[in-house]
């Protein structure tokens, strides 16, 4: 009697997990096929070409900053400037920026002053870039991005023609280590389902989001939402600014721009781990109960189908419902695999084979959620970009 009751509970849980993955597959397939692409609107003709200030914060980016700035200085748009801000780098980043600025009048080299304690480093650097800017439109991008020559003109054309207040592009995400390549498809399933362009672009939906690798906003509207000063303590400042835009009832458009911008998402497994922790730990401190529910949800939908499979074969094989449970488990795993492959190939534009590593990806994400839950109770430290930020309240402030 006990095994049957237990089997019934497990069966109900796994049916719910199956329903979740069915939903995810339908959602990401619909979103990928219907999401707008920059090339659809890139060639609109506009009469004016307002000046654009491209703001590039950089900290210890000697391996990527040169090719990034070269790609930005090679844009086919006429009226723009590039402002590169050194955020207290300890490598060759400052000298690379300085030497390049001497050769190209468009590039303005800025040394960020000492950062106040209640500011996150990148946010402070972006704010310094804004203060030095002279353009009507601001483009914020990262120092590890590479831009196609017509990325700026295409984005400005789209923004002006569509009478947008802000525009952000989904970049082609690049990573080099195998663990990150296996993890990214699974992680992006959740991100894509939450921050799908179809949701962000819906004015009736409150969800707003910027991709930090490329977001364009008029200086007037940037000031209206409070600049980076309003999100000075946010580790995920791009997402916070995107939310501010939607809260102010501004017209935000998120479009796929993988053919125009490439961005380095995680450089190694350590970067991947800390990138996840900077999202998860603040979540546990802001909304503890919700975070625990999310952690439990992540565990069940990612790992439970694999963990329960051998028990189904060993202990429930003689029950009629055991066969039903086995079928549900196998179908769920197949759907998980399908979602991962679809997201890898069509969503991330990387090889489909990386979607096959979904078991490793599921394990990494689940472990990070579980470990971060324990860490949030003790040493509330998040490491990001060679700095350690201590979280001493539910959300703020962060201290070096």
Where are these regions (language model features)?
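Short acidic donor-binding loop at the edge of a beta-strand
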Residues: 132-137
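Catalytic donor/gating beta->alpha subdomain of glycosyltransferases that bind UDP-sugars
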Residues: 159-162, 166-193, 220-223, 228-291, ...
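Acidic donor-binding/catalytic loop of UDP-sugar-dependent glycosyltransferases
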Residues: 92, 141-158
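Short beta-strand/loop segment that forms part of the nucleotide-sugar
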Residues: 79-88, 110-112
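N-terminal signal-anchor transmembrane helix
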Residues: 26-80, 89-90, 94-95, 99-100, ...
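N-terminal membrane-anchoring/stem segments of glycan-assembly enzymes
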Residues: 1-46, 185, 197, 365
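Long helical/loop segments within the catalytic core of UDP-sugar-dependent glycosyltransferases
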Residues: 20-23, 28, 108-131, 158-224, ...
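Membrane-embedded multi-pass helical conduit in multi-pass membrane proteins
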Residues: 293-379
């Amino acid at each position: 009697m006990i095994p049957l009751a237990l089997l019934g509970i497990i069966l109900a849980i796994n049916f719910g997990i199956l329903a979740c993955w069915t939903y995810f597959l339908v959602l990401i397939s619909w979103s990928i096929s219907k999401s707008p692409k920059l090339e659809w609107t890139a060639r609109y003709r506009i009469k004016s070409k307002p000046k654009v200030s491209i703001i590039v914060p950089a900290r210890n980016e000697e391996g990527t900053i040169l090719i990034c700035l070269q790609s930005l200085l090679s844009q086919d748009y006429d009226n723009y400037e590039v402002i590169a801000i050194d955020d207290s780098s300890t490598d060759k980043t400052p000298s690379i920026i300085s030497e390049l600025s001497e050769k190209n009048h468009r590039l303005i080299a800025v040394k960020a002053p000492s950062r106040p304690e209640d500011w996150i480093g990148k946010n402070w650097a972006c704010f310094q870039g804004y203060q030095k800017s002279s353009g009507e439109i601001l483009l914020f991008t990262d120092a590890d991005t590479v831009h196609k020559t017509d990325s700026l003109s295409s984005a400005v054309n789209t923004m002006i023609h569509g009478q947008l207040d802000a525009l952000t592009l989904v970049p082609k995400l690049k990573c080099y280590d195998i663990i990150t390549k296996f993890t990214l498809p699974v992680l992006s399933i959740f991100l894509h389902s939450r921050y799908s362009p179809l949701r962000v672009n819906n004015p009736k939906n409150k969800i707003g989001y910027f991709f930090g690798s490329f977001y364009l906003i008029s200086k007037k509207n940037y000031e209206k939402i409070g600049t980076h000063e309003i999100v000075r303590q946010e580790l995920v400042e791009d997402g916070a600014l995107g939310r501010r835009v939607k809260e102010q009832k501004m017209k935000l458009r998120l479009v796929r721009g993988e053919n125009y911008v490439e961005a380095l998402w995680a450089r190694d497994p350590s970067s991947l781990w800390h990138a996840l922790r900077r999202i998860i730990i603040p979540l546990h401190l802001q909304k503890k109960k919700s975070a625990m529910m999310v952690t439990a949800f992540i565990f069940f939908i990612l790992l439970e189908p694999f963990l329960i499979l051998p028990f189904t074969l060993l202990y429930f094989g003689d029950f009629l419902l055991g066969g039903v449970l086995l079928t549900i488990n196998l179908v769920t795993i197949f759907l998980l695999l399908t979602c991962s492959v679809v997201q890898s190939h069509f969503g991330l534009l990387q090889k489909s084979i990386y979607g096959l590593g979904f078991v490793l990806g599921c394990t990494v994400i689940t472990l990070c959620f579980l470990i971060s839950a324990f860490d949030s109770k003790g040493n509330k430290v998040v490491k990001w970009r060679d700095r350690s930020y201590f979280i001493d309240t539910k959300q703020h402030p962060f201290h070096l």
